[in-house]
Amino acid sequence: DAPVLSSRGKYKVGVKTIQVLNPKQIDIINSNKDQTVLYDRPLTLEIWYPALLENDIKEEVVYNQMMGNFSDPKRPLIPFKFKGRASRNAKSNRSDEPYPLIIVSHGYTGSRLMFTYLTENLASKGYVVVSIDHSDSTFNDANKFNSTLLNRSLDDLFVLNQIEKMSFDSSSFLYQLVDANNTALI
């Protein structure tokens, strides 16, 4: 038995992975007092959303994850897979759109897949959930902590703005699906 709030909601869950670039960001690792270096900051986003599934499609997904720290020989990167309860690239359920947005920001070090038990559950309850792989802050690419200090909140704001743009873009799967004015941050 699970506590009441941990049970699944009424919606089936879809999941997609997308890549976005935050242009002209300060590269704090390679900048110095004489020169500010800019770069286009890559971010991988995992997006869970209420979905419509055809009869033969199940909420089954396999996530590829990495644990460890690429720069620490005592904690080598170890790849593994785990199953989740979502359907990859499923059609979105538009019956109750727009859905509130939740942005998930992992710790240092971490990954966008750390809280799938929560992100899938929230999507089943009628939320669009976007989890960010923060560059320089994941198991796979952890770098100096000053990058995390500078970029974490900037990533969160950039992602909020990107999701809002996608909600107005008729070519996006998020078109009219998400209400970015009703957003929570975890």
Give the label of every model feature segment:
Residues 1-102:
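Domain-level recognition of soluble alpha/beta enzyme cores
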Residues 2-6, 28-29, 34-36, 141-152, ...:
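Generic detector of contiguous secondary-structure segments
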Residues 13, 102, 128-132, 159, ...:
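Hydrophobic aliphatic residue packing
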Residues 30, 57-61, 113-118, 140-144:
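Short, solvent-exposed loop/turn and secondary-structure capping segments
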Residues 39-42, 66-71, 125-128, 133, ...:
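Short, surface-exposed linear patches
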Residues 83-141:
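Short substrate-entry loop that stabilizes the transition state in hydrolases
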Residues 114, 118-124, 145-186:
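Alpha/beta-hydrolase active-site loop
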